[in-house]
Amino acid sequence: MQSFHVLQLIAVGFGGALGAMARFIVSNQVYAWWGRDFAWGTLVVNSLGSFAIGLIMILMIDKFHASVEMRSFLIVGFLGAFTTFSTFSFETYSFLQTGEITKAMLNIGVSVLTGLFAVWLGIWTGKQFFSP
């Protein structure tokens, strides 16, 4: 079993708290703008988080050589709490339970494809603007 430093644990905790608050704010604002007919809030935070992880990984590895504590804060803590697979799964299940099969399938397809595209876009952006 690999050990970790207490500072990593603290970094994950603080990052997680901030990420959870950011997710709450962003997803609620998205629902206020676009309504709750579809899982818009979850789709937006997961897409933003996917873009951010691609960009941040390039920046931390190629540009800034970030410490393990900073990586733990941003990737595991902040983005781990900001994005949410469990909410995506529950919303999809709820669509299925209410017979909204099209919405369920759309949620799965759009979420996965948007997430993959956002990661690619984040990596591409990082390499275009920040790599040597």
Swiss-Prot record:
Q: Which reaction does it catalyse?
A: fluoride(in) = fluoride(out)
**What is any one GO biological process for this UniProt entry?**
cellular detoxification of fluoride
What is reported on the regulation of this protein's activity?
Na(+) is not transported, but it plays an essential structural role and its presence is essential for fluoride channel function.
Tell me which residues bind Na(+): 80, 83
> Has keyword Transmembrane?
yes
Q: Where in the cell is it found?
A: Cell inner membrane
| A molecular function (GO) term | metal ion binding
Keywords of this entry: Cell inner membrane, Cell membrane, Ion channel, Ion transport, Membrane, Metal-binding, Sodium, Transmembrane, Transmembrane helix, Transport
- Top-rank taxon of the source lineage equals Bacteria
Q: Where are the transmembrane segments?
A: 6-26, 41-61, 73-93, 104-124
Q: What does the record say about its membrane topology?
A: Multi-pass membrane protein
Q: Which GO terms describe its cellular component?
A: plasma membrane
One Pfam family linked to the record: CRCB
Q: Which family does it belong to?
A: Belongs to the fluoride channel Fluc/FEX (TC 1.A.43) family.
Its biological purpose is as follows: Fluoride-specific ion channel. Important for reducing fluoride concentration in the cell, thus reducing its toxicity.
PANTHER family assigned to the protein according to its UniProt record, in alphabetical order: FLUORIDE EXPORT PROTEIN 1-RELATED
Name used for this protein in its record: Fluoride-specific ion channel FluC
State the species of origin: Hydrogenovibrio crunogenus (strain DSM 25203 / XCL-2)
Q: Which gene encodes it?
A: fluC
